[in-house]
Amino acid sequence: IEKFISDDTVCIDTGMKKERQRAEMAFEYAEKGNTVCVVSSGDAGIYGMAPLIYEMKREKESKVEIVSIPGISAFQKAASLLGAPMGHDFCVISMSDLMTPWHVIEKRIVAAAEADFITAVYNPKSNGRYWQLYRLKELFLKYRSEDNIVGYVRQAGREEQSVKITTLKDFNPEDIDMFTVVIIGNSQSYNWNGSFI
C-alpha cells in the first residue's frame, strides 16, 4: 500500500504478534489529534485488528472515533480462485490456539462437520502446530464422505500462489502451511471442470 501513502505520512510496522502494541501506538497518535489508519490484511473485522481496536477503545474509555472499512478476506480470495465454493451456508474456523483453547476449536470443527457447513479454515498450521490439521481431517471423515470436495489456496493473490482441488480422502495436511486457506465443501459441493462449486 506504500504507493498510496503520501511521503509525509508516518508509517509504523510492528509485524506479527505485536498487534496490541500497534493498537496502543494508534491510540497514542489519535488521542493527540492525528488521523490514524490501522491497516490489517484482508478484512480488519475478520481475524484482523478491528476487534482489538474496539476492545481497546472500551478499555481506555476513549473518545476517539473509529471508522471500520471492509476488505476482502482471505477465504473470499481463496474461494474466487477455486471457483464458487461458498454458495450456501458456511462457517470460518481458525485453527490457531493462541486465543482459543484446542478443545473449543475441536468442538467447533465437529459442529461444522456434523451440520454440513462449507468450512473455511484459517491458520491451518504453524511451526509449532501441525497435528491439529490431521485431527480436523479425521473429524470431518466421521461425518462426511471421503469423496467430499476440499480445496486449498496457498499464498492467495501473491506470486507464489498455488490452487488445488482434491477430496477429503486425498487431502494431505503435509501440503499445507500457515499461508494456506483450506475450504471444505458440504455434501452438495462438487468439482466441475476444475471448479469447486
Please report, for each region that a protein language model flagged, where it lies by residue.
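Class I S-adenosyl-L-methionine
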Residues: 1-66, 77, 172
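A contiguous loop/helix-start segment that scaffolds small-molecule binding in enzyme catalytic cores
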Residues: 35-36, 114-197
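Non-catalytic terminal and connector segments of soluble metabolic enzymes
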Residues: 20, 24, 109-115, 127
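Class I SAM-dependent methyltransferase SAM-binding "motif I" and its flanking Rossmann-like core
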Residues: 45-115
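Glycine-/small-residue-rich active-site loops that bind phosphorylated ligands and cofactors
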Residues: 18, 44-45, 97-100, 125-128
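Short acidic loop-to-helix transition motifs that present clustered carboxylates
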Residues: 18-22, 74, 98, 157-158
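Conserved beta-strand scaffold positions in the cores of enzyme catalytic domains, especially
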Residues: 11-13, 66-68, 92, 150-152
